[in-house]
Amino acid sequence: MAEERRNRWGGVAAPLVGAAVGFAVGAIVGGGMLPRIYDWTTEWNIDAPRAEVFRILSAPEEQRHWWPSMIVERVEPLPDNPDGRIITYRVLQAPSVRRVAPPFILVSTIGDVDRDRRTRAVVTGDLAGVLETLLYDRPDGGTRIVYHWYTRVTNPLLNALGFVMAPVFRASHDHVMREGEAGLQAYCAARLGQRSVPATDIETRQAGS
């Protein structure tokens, strides 16, 4: 069934991409295209204390263990800000979209940090805007994370694809965020000894989802 859906998608993907490329070229040659604006909110619920969740979210060197679609390419310190950093990501689309939409680059400059509670990042690269991450205690001792994305697309091809494939791009975003929530949940559980889940098992399970 999954293979049949992929084949059906493959049959319509090429015309859509062709239309998007033509749209992008025409817009660029003809005088420009309004950028796509994305204003999305995502909520995660993690069964781990807020301080531990914040620590993991602030450790890009650990991210490959629990969020394989958000590939950390480079980490740089932020001058004059010991809590800040500049992280370059290569972001993979959902598997159903990867054949038509290439990975995109995000450069996240995290300069506003309220330890254990909040971070605010200025995003550049193929998207430009702001990502705010808020952490809250749950009554049961877990953590609620709220991501606020407000970005515009700067990559002309991705911008054009966004006009003709908006529902697909939203589904891809939701897939990547669900992967992150599930991966972080499993990673925290393993670290806290709630159950033994090796990092390689987390990555394998997510890759097959």
Model-predicted segments: where are they?
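A short acidic/glycine-rich loop-to-helix N-cap element
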Residues: 152-176
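Hydrophobic ligand-binding cavity/cleft-lining segments
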Residues: 11-83, 208
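Charged, low-complexity N-terminal segments of organelle-associated membrane proteins
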Residues: 1, 117-120, 169
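Glycine-rich portal/gate segments that line the openings of hydrophobic small-molecule binding cavities
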Residues: 10, 14-18, 65, 74-130, ...
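Short amphipathic alpha-helical segments
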Residues: 49-55, 172, 176, 180
